[in-house]
Amino acid sequence: MKKCMWLLAFCCSSAIAIAQDNDHPDSLLLRRQLFVLRNVIAAKGEQLSERERLYYQAYLDNFFNKGQTSNTSIDLLLQKYRADLTAKQVSELLQVKIDNLVKAYRYKAAYTSSMYLLDSFKTTLPEKDQAAIRNAAVIWEGLQEIAPQELTVVQDTHVPFKRDAVGLVNIPVSIGDTSNEFVFDTGAGISTITESSAARNHLTPMNKYFDVEAATGGIVKARIAVVKELKIGGILVKNAVFMVFPDSALTWPEAKYGIKGIIGFPVIEQMGEIRINSKEGLLEVPQQPLPGSYANFGLSNLRPVINVAYKKDSLPFIFDTGATATALNAPFFKKYRKEVMRRGKPFRLPQGGAGGVNTVNAYRLPEIVLGIADKKPRLPHIPVITAPVMEEDRYYYGNLGQDIMKQYREMVISFRYMYVSFND
């Protein structure tokens, strides 16, 4: 089940002339192949000019969760080389800067930068991008006077979780004196709560509405509410931002299933490291995250991305603990079309999340073997969607779900050191 994300477009395209070579840095950036781009830039080393290094590093540091370093590169690039950049390049760099500001909870600066971008690049930004920036600015405007989110882990924490009727991880969340069971979902950009749950937890949504793109491609009207304090086991979170959805957007009557709330990326990321122990039903958050030997994890806006190997190829996948099963996207179908059509059987795939359910054309492969870090999970009956439903489906080859996570005793996600690993 893919989750929604609001319409804050992350435009990675470059206005530098795109070479035909698929391994050219500009082509890799355009196709959001950031894991490959990292290796290419490291190999080129001194062959790159300072302007080129700053340019590519701004995107790479944004992707690998080094927002402050990314913004330092952007500021220096605009200070020293703005005359060498096109208006399109500058506008896209400013969008990266806004994303870094949002991840640092600097909402006022994000709003100011958004307004500057809209005022200064009217003739450069496509109308679709302007609408997305304007839509997201509604959120940042409402949060201008809100203090940054704070999350405190005073000791190694173990939080028991339950799986609901569709297999999603639900954790206990306390808001004031009210106890809740919310879905724990790395694929949710901003934490989400239904209108009835917001009222039950004495939350007051802000007045302005903004648009959220649902997994079906439809639009949900949402508002923002700020939770002054919430607790997840012994973890205290202050000033957590929630999107407030109409109950109908998180209810599926035909399945007799509904979601009251979702703990999403901003809260999960600030935990530093999480360990989901499927065998014991425990969410573990260590006080001190542990370094890893590789970095196979990145962020596209607030969407986790993981590096996956298939055959000899390195492919970026969305990494979504709120997805019950793995699905392969349109880029996978395009790249391996002959194999998919030869081995697979066509069918209509129900697909949905916050906002409803739709069906899309797909093929079902009997089995596929993927490479993730040092593991090679086998996935039977895997669907391959033939056309993009959401914008991100144009770039990411699949959406990893819980069918992979359940094959291992423990899954580790480190936002501090940017890796994902699985332990038997």
Regions found by a protein language model. Give the residues of each.
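Bacterial Sec-dependent N-terminal signal peptides
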Residues: M1-S27
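Pepsin/retropepsin-fold aspartyl endopeptidases
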Residues: Q20-D424
